[in-house]
Swiss-Prot record:
Family: Belongs to the GPN-loop GTPase family.
Motif (Gly-Pro-Asn (GPN)-loop) on chain: 70-72
InterPro entries named among the record's database cross-references: Gpn, Gpn3, P-loop_NTPase
Residues under site feature: Stabilizes the phosphate intermediate: N72
Positions with biased composition (Acidic residues): 263-275
UniProt keyword Signal, yes or no: no
Organism of provenance: Dictyostelium discoideum
Pfam name, any one: ATP_bind_1
Positions that bind GTP: G13, S14, G15, K16, S17, T18, T172, K173, I174, D175
Function: Small GTPase required for proper localization of RNA polymerase II (RNAPII). May act at an RNAP assembly step prior to nuclear import.
Keywords, comma-separated and alphabetical: GTP-binding, Hydrolase, Nucleotide-binding
Protein name, per record: GPN-loop GTPase 3
UniProt key word Lyase: no
Amino acid sequence: MGKHVQLVMGPAGSGKSTYCDTMRKYCEEIKRSVHIVNLDPAAEVFEYPVSVDIKNLVTVDEVMDELHYGPNGGLVYAMEYLIENMDWLTDELGDYEDDYLIIDCPGQIELYSHIPVMRILVDHLQQIGYSVCSVFLVDSQFILDNCKFISGALMCLSAMVRLEVPHINVLTKIDVLKTSDQYKEIEKFLDLEVQNLVEELNLETHDRYHRMNKAIGSLLEDFSLVGFVPLDITDQESLNVLLQHIDNSIQYGEDLEPKEPPLENDDDDDDDEGDEIIRMMNGNL
């Protein structure tokens, strides 16, 4: 079936680790073997079993102690160190034919928008035979109004344009909002018309921003980036719909051979139908 990757991204607090663990458990339930890769050199506690861990190569604490960097500088250095040692990652991933990886990435947005670390990582994964889908998580509680939605959408756009791979935007923590009145606010963003968004933004902002609102709306519409897949981790159907979106984007399972029905059963069914017809004909004679 080939080798496939979910590259799980999103700002801190968007639920990346919870997503990875939930998706792993769901895949196990549907008999799909997955491996989780931790690429956050600052991660301390895992909610899931880790198959490959960047901290076996480098940690942020080590960088901060040895080079006296701050947390963000230490993270960037650690990720650049990974890029310089891609052979380590290749060896850790192995060379299996049917790999399905879920890669838990750091949350610092500069890794996707300012420096080429994640793009180099994606290119390397593709070179060694992986089909990659970027899964960008946004906390649904973060986009409860139009301005916040624009901010979240532009953040997704930055990662999508930078990486140039199939891209799925996910609204997380829907299960939290379902029990509150705020869920109605989220629903309008799930099937949003850009023109309506621009009109509402114009009502909320000064006249001098109206041209900018229109330009941003056109940008999002041109890139078809107003679509988010809602995720309720307590709902199996929600997980199934999201996984189907991801699978379609990386063509997972398309090379599977269709199963043919057993011939013996078909023959038996045909014989039964023939006997019944003969009995009916005899009864009418």
